[in-house]
C-alpha cells in the first residue's frame, strides 16, 4: 500500500483510511469515469493503474462507467457550463473505452457497472430526497462554483446535481474508498456526506496528481489535443513522451512507472549534478511506459525509430505517392484527409495551426497552398510529437 500512499495527493480522512487497512477485510475501491471521449489517455491510465494496484493488494475494483453523469457533465474546474452530450455519443464512447479498460484491470476482483442502471430510475421523490442531503452554502464552498457565482457566470442546477449523483454512485456500490484525480477531491468528500445521509459508513477519499499534457501546461485532455493515447503505436507513444517538457517528466515517472520514489529522486539528483542529460533520462521513461503498454521488444523498436527519424534525420526508404488534383490552389486539410495523413479535415486544420505539418522538413501553417509547391515534395505530419509515423509520410506527385 506504500506505493499508493507515496503517490496520493490527498487521503481524507487518514484515520479512517488506516482503520480500513487495519480491518484486514477486502475493500470496495470505487473509480468513476465518464465516457466523454472515445479513447483512453495516459491521464486516465495513471488512475487506472492505481485501481489495479488496489486489486493486487487483494481489494475489489468497482469501475463505474458514468453513462448517466456524462450527459450532465462534470463541472469540476470549469469556468462555464459544459455542453450536454447525447446518449448515442456516450454509448459509442463507452463501446470504445470499455475493452481498453478491461485489458488494463485484472479480471479477478473486478466489477464494471454503469450508473445509468440506477440514476436513470430515480423518481422525483428520490431526487428531492437526494437534494436534501446538502445545501446551497455547501455547494458554493467549491472554488469553481464560488468563482462563477461571484463573477455572475451562469451555474445550472444540473451542475449542482453532478456531485450529488457521483455521491449517490458511492451509495449504490457501497464504496469503502473512492479514488480519482485531485480535481475530484471536493466531489469525493461530498460523497461521504451523501453516504452518511443514507445511513452508510462514509468512504475515504483518495486522490492523485493530474497528469499534465504534452503542452506542459494543462491537464492531459482529448479536447485540448495534448494527450497521449495508450492505444497509439509504440513509436508514437515513445515519441510523444520524448516531446514533453523536462520539468514534467517526474510526474510521469511517479504515476506511470513502478519505480520507488527514492529511485526517482536519484534520477533527479543525477541531472542536478550534471551527471546525466535530461534527454537520456526521458528515454528511460519512454521505454518504461512503452514496455508496460506493449512489451520490451516494441519499446526497443520505438526507441530506434525515434533516434533514426528524429536524431539522425533519416526518412523511410519507401514513401507513397499520390496524384495531385488539377487545380491551381489546394486546400490542405482536404488533401491531407483524402490521401490518408489525417482522419478528418478538422484534425488536419488543428494540426496545421499547431505547427505540426511540414513540407520537405519546412514547417507550413497556411491552410491553402499552391499546387506547384506540393509537387514531388514530402509531406510530414508530426502529430505534436517530433516524430512521424510511416503511414503519415506522403509525397504528392503527378503520377
Walk through the language-model features, giving the residues of each.
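Short, hinge-like loop/turn segments at secondary-structure boundaries
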Residues: 78-83, 128-132, 223-224
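Hydrophobic alpha-helical segments, chiefly the membrane-spanning helices
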Residues: 396-399
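Short, conserved acidic/polar surface loops in the N-terminal third of protein domains
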Residues: 72-77, 123-125
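N-terminal regions that are enriched for targeting/export leaders
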Residues: 1-9
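Conserved nucleotide- and phosphate/pyrophosphate-binding catalytic cores
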Residues: 194-384, 388, 392
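Divalent-metal (Mg2+/Mn2+/Ca2+)-assisted nucleotide/phosphate chemistry catalytic cores
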Residues: 8, 86-87, 91-207, 216
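A charged helix-plus-loop insertion that forms the helical arch/lid used to bind
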Residues: 75-91
